[in-house]
């Protein structure tokens, strides 16, 4: 326990918060080019074929990014926008690809949570 005089002289050291998305270099999103688009299986209790892309960002970093939603149009050399956000059951996947931005199309036929998947507002049905 420091004395008051020691605190006056030196003060307390601030705890620095470590970023969970280091490759973005303190930016909200980064542009990148897909180097590989593939599917992978999740960790133990879950079972699926999760769509993932290996992306080379504009700052030179290579990351694994998850492709959310049903169906996608990504292939090698597609330009994508990458945001932070991990996928809990995929080890090593700490980034998400933004749907509806750059070369990535929005999810077709999506009616709810459309903004998260880059889907346009559906046309109203005639009464």
Swiss-Prot record:
Modified residues (3-methylthioaspartic acid): 89
Molecular function per GO: rRNA binding; structural constituent of ribosome; tRNA binding
Biological source species: Flavobacterium psychrophilum (strain ATCC 49511 / DSM 21280 / CIP 103535 / JIP02/86)
Assigned protein family: Belongs to the universal ribosomal protein uS12 family.
Record keyword rRNA-binding present: yes
Gene (name only): rpsL
Alphabetized CDD domains for the sequence: Ribosomal_S12 (cd03368)
Pfam families: Ribosom_S12_S23
NCBIfam families attached to this UniProt entry: rpsL_bact
Protein name: Small ribosomal subunit protein uS12
PANTHER family per the UniProt record, alphabetical: 30S RIBOSOMAL PROTEIN S12 FAMILY MEMBER
Keywords: Methylation, Ribonucleoprotein, Ribosomal protein, RNA-binding, rRNA-binding, tRNA-binding
Biased composition annotated in UniProt, kind: Basic residues: 111-127
Superkingdom per UniProt: Bacteria
